[in-house]
Design a protein with these regions (language model features):
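Acyl-donor (CoA/ACP) binding surface of acyl/acetyltransferases
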Residues: 1-22, 59-162
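Phosphate/oxyanion-binding loops and surfaces in catalytic or ligand/nucleic-acid-binding neighborhoods
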Residues: 22-23, 49
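A short, aromatic/hydrophobic, helix- or strand-capping loop or linear motif
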Residues: 28-33, 53-59
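Hydrophobic alpha-helical membrane context
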Residues: 34-36, 49, 156
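A short helix-loop-beta-strand connector motif used in the catalytic cores of GNAT acetyltransferases and
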Residues: 44-58, 67
Length: 162
């Protein structure tokens, strides 16, 4: 398995937008499935924002698009939110864990941040396992706090400090 992580480029955005139109990919995300053009415009705006504290990367296996991962700036000093979405064709192969390892290294070594936070719905067992395997600690659970398509989900909040 040869994964590469590259900073987001404009030509990557259609692949991300296609992935985020998939119902299965977005099932446990707090957004989506998205309209292709809305997603494309959202990522283009992020790419063009030179003052952004967000770091977005595409994930590829050889030349195949696997997904995207990011560290998103937060209001808390020296703290980033970890995010990753993988195309469902690549689930269950350990790529989410590898994306997390990459982001943790980038956050602590390159950005010199002190803390990374993350969250997921409690039903998103894959993401929960990834966070735990990466060393994140569960710090809080909010019950039935997010309504997605009429279903109330519990949200798990995680933290990892250097």
């Amino acid at each position: 398995m040869s994964l590469t992580f590259e900073k987001l480029k404009a030509q990557d955005i259609p692949e991300i937008a296609n992935m985020l139109t998939k119902k299965e990919v977005c099932k446990y995300l707090n957004f989506g499935p998205n309209d292709f053009n809305e997603t494309k415009n959202y990522f283009l705006a992020m790419l063009e924002d030179k003052n952004s504290s967000n770091y977005i990367f595409t994930i590829r296996e050889n030349s195949d698009f696997v997904g995207q991962c990011a560290l998103l700036g937060t209001d808390e000093k020296d703290t980033y939110l970890i995010a990753y979405q993988l195309d469902n064709n690549f689930w269950g192969k350990g790529y989410g864990y590898l994306a997390g390892k990459f982001l943790i290294g980038f956050a602590f070594e390159t950005l010199k941040t002190k803390k990374i936070i993350g969250d997921c719905f409690s039903e998103n067992l894959g993401s929960k396992k990834i966070m735990e395997k990466l060393g994140f600690k569960l710090i809080k659970t909010e019950y039935k706090n997010f309504d997605k398509n009429g279903i109330l989900y519990d949200t798990l909040y995680f933290s990892l400090e250097k």
